Amino acid sequence: MDLDPRLRILLTGALFATGGAAIKACTLPGPQISAMRAVVAALTLFLLLPEARRLPSARVLLVLPAYFGSTFLFVVANKLTTAANAIFLQATAPLWVAMLGPALLGERPRRSEWFALVCIALGMGLFFLAGEDASATAPSPLLGNIIAVVSGVSFGLLLVGFRWLGRRGKGEQSAVVAWGNLFTAACGSLVMLALDVPFGTPTPKDWVILVAIGSVQVGCAYALLVRSMPLVPAVQASLLLMIEPALNPLLAFLVHGERPHPMAVAGGALIVGAVTASTLLARKRT
């Protein structure tokens, strides 16, 4: 039996959640992890999404930078700040969807979704008030937090782009994630060269991590996402995806013993609680 599109988006979020702990376990620089993961993800997506194998259209090319920003910047942020901060700050995406949706999609958030969006903004503020110290798994928290917010802006633009492309019904969303990973691999490598970031030599464990996060955490997850986005309003989809922040910090704690600041925990609880309430209300109306 085919899963409800909302459940598929929740499963997507659960797969995304495995990335934080896995990225921190990899010894390579963040930009290199992003680029190499993208190569594996592209191969997986071209296998799973036959409609993505044709050359991208001009519409698809417009959305590729948003894909690059959301995935590349998240990996970099995750190597600089805690997994909790990286994912919760990327989870500001619904704010940007709500701001851009009326103009670009003609979709306005429901009242319950606005409540969740306000809570997201308040939660985001708590992360920057925390003033966390550097640690082994979070060597530059402030810079990582800033990059994570920009990643959230990019992810919001990506969700808007998915919804926009999905209205045409031509499989262009599939092309975005497949070609977007090739775009990310190329641009990520160029960023490393431009910033003079040394390329590391992957260990056997690094290779296992890269293949796993490329094929499952990105490849399978985005295959589910592009099949579901045309069927769910953009703001609601972005809210459903925030099951990821509930799982991501937990996995980072279990694997690395990483403990986010208490104010970050409070911000995360505020966000997840609001999203859960908003999603339940939306479910009752459908």
Regions found by a protein language model. Give the residues of each.
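Helix-helix packing/entry segments at the starts of transmembrane helices
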Residues: 86-92, 162-185, 218-254
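Specific alpha-helical transmembrane segments that line the substrate/conduction pathway
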Residues: 32-35, 39-40, 75-108, 112-113, ...
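Transmembrane alpha-helical segments that form core, pore/gating elements
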Residues: 13-16, 45, 97-98, 134-196
